[in-house]
Amino acid sequence: AKRDAAKCDAAKCDAERIRMQNLVDWMKRRMDKCLPGMMISLSIQFFTLPLVAYYYYEIPVYAILLNIPVLALIPYVLGLAVFGSLTGQIAFLQPLSFALCRVCGWVLHGYRWLCDASLLLPGARMITGKPSEVRVVVYYGLLGAFYYVLWCGMKKKQRQMCTKGAQAEKQEWIRRRFGFGLGLVLVLLLTFLFVRGKPEFELDILDVGQGDAIYLCASDGTNFMIDGGSTDVKKVGTYRILPFLKAKAIRKVDYWFVSHTDEDHISGLVEVMESGYAVGTLVLAEAQKEDEKAYRLAELAQKNGIRVCYMKAGDVLGTRKEDVVNERNRAETFRIECLYPTNNNDSEDVNDRCLVLYYEDENFSAFFGGDISSEVEEQLVSAGKCRQTDVLKASHHGSKYSNSDVLLHALHPRLTIASAGKKNRYGHPSPEAIARVGESGSTFYSTIDYGRIRVRFVDGEMVAEPYRKCL
């Protein structure tokens, strides 16, 4: 009885092993049939990836998987479409033509639905930044070399295989070589397209027309934005601010400061938050906490998982003293101090309740005054809060009622940069303000003439790099 039971168990094990082997064989046959489609899909992705990254600054992560069913269905869809077009020329076959074309439409709409649905999945887009032309050329050269070597190997292997099992052996050889080559190409892709060096200090005054949008990369790599809006550039967040951030491969803005809630300072920020782009903390002036616009902005931020905090005069954001452990680390320290307003400021003019910020690190300093008037500027100077500055972001877009002599002489900026729109109705930047800046010895730049203006250090020297030359 025991021997019979043992034989029965052995038979069951053999049957189970056979079933598993059949399943494995079936899966291998399926993989062999899918392999050509997967190779074509991967080849298309590898070929188009640099161009997509170069022009859109991000890549769709799930595109490779989505292309597999498309490649499988395309021959049938094209065949049905051609046959439907031909039958449509014959009167009594037009109902058939309509039905065939309707089926093709369903397939295409289904694929579009899959594409839209894939973008809702976590990690659907990967921000890569804009690769340099050199990296793109090197990438294509290496990719071409890889495919040439693979093609030569396949031809050689094909000549060697003359036995009955040649086709299966060829499939196995392709699978192994393509898998190895795929890994190699991925390494090259990461190396030549997406690997970037350590972030360096950079200040950018974006060209957003009649508005403000300022990007600041601190000396330790922390990403800041100050304001983000416009009254004359439509969809400024979608078509100016987000493309700028993505082109620089910035996947998250750590802190987004809002000087005040006028449309020319927040319209783009609202679009950015609604798009789902990652923002760590939204920073508002505590004196504006009860304003309706500020309340709605904070509510939108919290709805999108963004932390909201409020600053008042005397608050400081930056590197803690205990975090400074050596001289190398000291060079990466920074501080952003709120100079104005106090938490009990009750000025009726929202411009005079603007968040005024002063950035400072080992080599650079900048003053950001929002839209404050000359009266507030004089208050800050009288309180001893203004000291020598490398860059002054011109207050109120270069208005003649701001950027006073008192402030300019206290800050003594090397550069003064105004953000304004062409032919704006306010006359910004005003000739009076430009004249005062010139008299103070500061070099004046305007986004009207120069477009985006970048300030960075080259060989230890601060330089201003306008996007275009002044005509």
Residue ranges and their predicted role:
Residues 1-4, 17-82, 124-128:
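Membrane-embedded alpha-helical bundles of multi-pass enzymes
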